């Protein structure tokens, strides 16, 4: 899988687009980050509870895409 190009948005939020996936990481509070992955505009996976930082949220979102592509 190619490297994800994460784009910063307003605040401490990030988005990456890969094929037909949209990956998002958003800051929800001090040391609270939420991540989600959408495929074809439908929920694929998301985090609950929150992760500890943006980088970890990005890794979890990318793992979701890898798992989906491999059929895991």
Provide a role label for each language-model segment:
Residues 1-34:
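Short N-terminal "domain-start" leader segments
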Residues 1-9, 34, 38-72:
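Mixed-charge, Lys/Arg-enriched low-complexity segments
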């Amino acid at each position: 899988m190619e490297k994800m190009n994460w784009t910063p948005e307003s605040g401490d939020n990030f988005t990456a687009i890969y094929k037909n996936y949209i990956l998002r990481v958003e800051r929800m509070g001090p040391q609270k980050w939420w991540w989600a992955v959408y495929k074809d505009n439908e929920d694929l996976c998301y985090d609950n509870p929150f992760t500890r930082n943006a980088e970890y949220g990005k890794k979890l979102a990318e793992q979701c895409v890898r798992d989906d592509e491999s059929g895991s």
